[in-house]
Regions:
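Glycoside hydrolase catalytic-domain context in secreted enzymes
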Residues: 1-170
Length: 170
């Protein structure tokens, strides 16, 4: 199956952000509805989508290092809402983990975001891929919910095989 690396459905929070033009809206409801319809349209034509950048990746400056601190309410009602809508209403096939940290955990190995919320609460059945070079570990990422490391196999190649064979990852 071919996969579109999009749509990018982060909230347009910073007007001067380098990738704000990619995001659908500053309004979480509108972003969610647009993401749902984009996903349905693409996947109805046998093209998988990969919703990005999950989650709270709303600025370019220091995006690979920033540790986002946000209230539970703001996170759920603003920043996660478009992702939740596209997962629940359109069964998005893929999600791309963002570069940043959320509450001290890299998005690519964030058990709460990937396993508990995305898969647990929302019922996501697809694959989670890292942003390019956005994987930071083997065991923590594998157990934290990441399925595919992009664009190489630094952590999910031999290191992952060794972890599986050692019984650290199952």
């Amino acid at each position: 199956k071919d996969m579109i690396l999009g749509p990018a459905i982060n909230i347009q929070r910073i007007p001067t952000g380098g990738r704000t033009y990619e995001y659908l809206s500053e309004d979480p409801l509108l972003s969610g509805e647009l993401a749902v319809n984009y996903t349905l349209g693409a996947q109805d034509h046998q093209e998988a989508v990969c919703l990005k950048h999950y989650a709270l990746n709303n600025q370019e400056n220091m995006r690979g290092f920033v540790d986002v601190k946000v209230s539970e309410r703001a996170m759920r009602e603003i920043y996660l809402a478009p992702f939740e809508a596209a997962v629940k209403k359109a069964n998005a096939y893929g999600v791309m983990a963002a570069y940043n940290k959320v509450s001290g955990e890299w998005c690519s190995e964030n058990d709460r975001l990937l396993n508990k919320i995305l898969r647990g609460e929302w019922g996501f059945k697809g694959i989670v891929i890292s942003d390019w070079g956005g994987t930071h570990s083997t065991t923590k990422a594998a157990l934290g919910g990441l399925d595919v490391e992009m664009p190489n196999d630094r952590y999910f190649g031999k290191a992952l095989l060794d972890s599986v064979q050692a019984g650290v990852v199952s």
